[in-house]
Amino acid sequence: MADLEGKVTVVTGAASGIGRAVAERLAAEGMHVVGVDIRSDGPVTVEADLTTREGNKRAVDAALEAHGRIDVVVPNAGVQHVSPVADFPEDRWDQLTSLLLTSPFLLAKYAWPSLVESGGRYVAIASVHGVVASPFKSAYISAKHGLLGLVKVLALEGAPDGVTATAVCPGYVRTPLVENQIADQAKAHGMDEDRVLEDVILAPHAVKRLVEPAEVADAVVWLLGPAGRTMTGTPLVMDQGWSAR
């Protein structure tokens, strides 16, 4: 069991989906959770635009002002855009890479002195798309691959001070982001949503079901527990057999 009572964590994208599940689970474990999102909902305590330097600084500063320390950082906030490379809007590329890669870097940078002091943990929510690729998702996949590279660097730099850095890489998770993709694919293919889920979304999964947000939260808690001390610089892939193909 993870002994997380009284520790302080910053969780981004906490208004819904994986971020909300992680924030609520860590609060149930006794942690002080600073939930960050662009909109205030559920466990969100700090509203911030994480595509900006100022927003990321605000998130870290709010945690330090409220609790005086940061023990855990969970960068999770995400967004998706699907388009062929030739048609991919440059502003959407900038938005996705800012949120999915630059924000995790800035959160690590600003929180690093506190993580070093506490021997803390950095657990990024990445994706199976950090280890495999699919067409039409160039920004998302580039950012998630880059995030795994960042985790490796943080692990090496943090090791002398007892700081670990890992990433959770789930397959498709039952979140609003994925549910919107199902609806969009149903319209595009002229199929009902159940068929899209099985024949399109879950086609790469060996196990034909969506990962639940609570299962990702379970993985985060495991990484923050005693067994997680041996995990650093490497992803925990929970992709229902996708990357085994």
Protein language model regions, located:
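Short C-terminal tail/terminal secondary-structure segment
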Residues: 5, 132, 220, 232-245
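Short, small/polar-rich loop/turn modules that mediate ligand/substrate recognition or access, typified
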Residues: 74, 159, 164, 231-233
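Substrate-binding pocket helix/loop in short-chain dehydrogenase/reductase
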Residues: 84-85, 92-97, 201
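Active-site helix of classical SDR
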Residues: 108, 143, 151
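Alpha-helical segment proximal to the catalytic Tyr-Lys
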Residues: 113, 156-157
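Residue(s) in the substrate-gating loop at a strand-loop-helix junction
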Residues: 127
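C-terminal helical subdomain
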Residues: 167, 175, 191-231, 238-240
